[in-house]
A protein has these predicted regions:
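Eukaryotic N-terminal low-complexity, Ser/Thr- and Lys/Arg-rich leader segments
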Residues: 1-2
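Residue-level recognition of specific faces of alpha-helices
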Residues: 5-8, 119
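Active-site-proximal alpha-helix that buttresses catalytic centers in soluble enzyme cores
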Residues: 7-9, 13-82, 136-139
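Phosphate-handling substructures
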Residues: 78-143
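Short, intrinsically disordered, charge-balanced linker/junction segments flanking boundaries
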Residues: 146-149
Length: 149
């Protein structure tokens, strides 16, 4: 079976994105720019779907459970003229968990534990922030989601 075509859309900007803060699993809402970005993503997706010969109403839509991802999805679907709430939620699509570093900027995380921060920068796939996830953990949960497509 050929690999499915997947259109990924990242959530729009939040104030924490603009400030350089690690959001991870914290539910930080979209800001005004983020809402505009989501609408633009919907318009771009409409063009991609038309180019690829797909009908938006015929493809599945899935989002992370975080509010910023859900609102992005709803704004994208509105731009596609689809029912805004007709999509699935899958927790495996959530952003990487940064544990105790969530809410911090990278300089703040570095200052809190310079040794661990350096190890994490050098080996993101195998080293996690305290209470957070490794990239390997994210790959595993995302891989499980992808295998079910």
């Amino acid at each position: 079976m050929p690999a499915p075509t997947i259109y990924y859309i990242r959530h729009g900007e939040t104030d924490w994105n603009a400030e350089g803060r690690l959001q991870g699993t914290l539910d930080v809402p979209l800001n005004e720019l983020g809402r505009r970005q989501a609408v633009s993503a919907g318009i771009i997706l409409a063009g991609l779907l038309a180019r690829d010969g797909h009908e938006a109403a015929q493809i599945p839509f899935v989002a992370s459970p975080l509010g910023r991802a859900r609102l992005t999805m709803e704004l994208v679907r509105r731009a596609l003229k689809l029912p805004v709430d007709d999509y699935a939620i899958d927790p495996r699509l959530r952003e990487i968990g940064y544990g105790q570093w969530e809410g911090s900027t990278l300089p703040e995380a570095r200052a809190a534990d310079p040794e661990l921060f350096a190890r994490r920068v050098a080996a993101k796939w195998t080293v996690a922030a305290p209470g957070g996830e490794r990239y390997l953990d994210v790959e595993t949960r995302m891989g499980a989601w992808y295998a079910e497509l």
